[in-house]
């Protein structure tokens, strides 16, 4: 292999560049999406982002179960 050393240097340079790009990017989409899911259904443990969606879910999936008190005044 005539370019063995050059290949290794190129790989190291690329790894350093990729690490810099990842650090510059800051956050990932999965963590942000997971943080947005703050409401959890007490019956099925499904997570929802806002109370309106939570109330719609509860009324459609669990119609026989009484509505939780935090959803009583939410407009769906």
UniProtKB/Swiss-Prot annotation:
Zinc finger (C2H2-type): 39-62
Recorded GO CC terms: cytoplasm; nucleus
Alphabetic keyword roster: Cytoplasm, Metal-binding, Nucleus, Repressor, Translation regulation, Zinc, Zinc-finger
Entries under InterPro entries matching the protein: MBS1/2-like, SERF-like_N, ZNF706/At2g23090_sf, Znf_C2H2_type
Keyword Signal on entry: no
Molecular functions (GO terms): zinc ion binding
Entry-linked Pfam families: SERF-like_N, zf-met
PANTHER family recorded: GEO09665P1-RELATED (PTHR21213), ZINC FINGER PROTEIN 706 (PTHR21213:SF0)
Name of this protein: Zinc finger protein 706
Organism of provenance: Mus musculus
Originating gene: Znf706
């Amino acid at each position: 292999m005539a370019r063995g050393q050059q290949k290794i240097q190129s790989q190291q340079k690329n790894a350093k560049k990729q690490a810099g790009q990842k650090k510059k990017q800051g956050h990932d989409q999965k963590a942000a999406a997971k943080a947005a899911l703050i409401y959890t259904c007490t019956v099925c443990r499904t997570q929802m982002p806002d109370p309106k969606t939570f109330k719609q879910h509860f009324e459609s999936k669990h119609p026989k179960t009484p509505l939780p008190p935090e959803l009583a005044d939410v407009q769906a």
